[in-house]
Amino acid sequence: MSKKNSELKARFRRSPEWKNFRKHMAELYDNKDAITGKPLRKGWNLHHMDMAVENYKDLCEDKYIPLNRASHELIHTAFRYSYAIDKLVYYVQKMEEINKKKEK
C-alpha cells in the first residue's frame, strides 16, 4: 500500500463517521471478536473484508467485522495463504485427536 493511501485511510479513521460506524459495529457484535467470541480488547480492529483501497469508505455492515489483534493478524495470514486452509484444518483436527488420546 502506498504512503498516500495509508495517509488517506488514517485520516478517514479519525473522522466522526468512521468512529460512529466502528462503535456501531462493536455493538452489533455485542462487543465481541467475530472469530473467537471473546470480548473486544483495547486496540481492537474493525477489519475491512473488501481489500480494495477505493472501497475503503464504503461503510456497509457486511464488509466489516470487529476483531482483536490476534484474530486480525490470523485472518490476514489466512487470506494470504487461503490455498492451504484445507491442510491447516486437517492438521489441527489431527492435533486434536492426538491430544484427546493423551487425556484418556
Task: List each language-model region with its residue ranges.
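Intrinsic-disorder/low-complexity regions
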Residues: K4, K19, D30-K32, L67, ...
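Short cysteine-rich loop/turn motifs with clustered Cys
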Residues: E17-N45, A70
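A generic structural signal for solvent-exposed, polar alpha-helical segments
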Residues: W18, H24-E27, D50, E54, ...
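Histidine-centered nuclease catalytic patch
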Residues: A34-P66, I75-Y81, D86
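Generic alpha-helix detector with strongest preference for long hydrophobic helices that associate
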Residues: S2-E7, E27-D30, H48-M49, R69
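A boundary/linker detector
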Residues: M1-N20, G37-P39, S82-K104
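Short Fe-S-cluster ligation motifs
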Residues: K63-L74, K94-K104
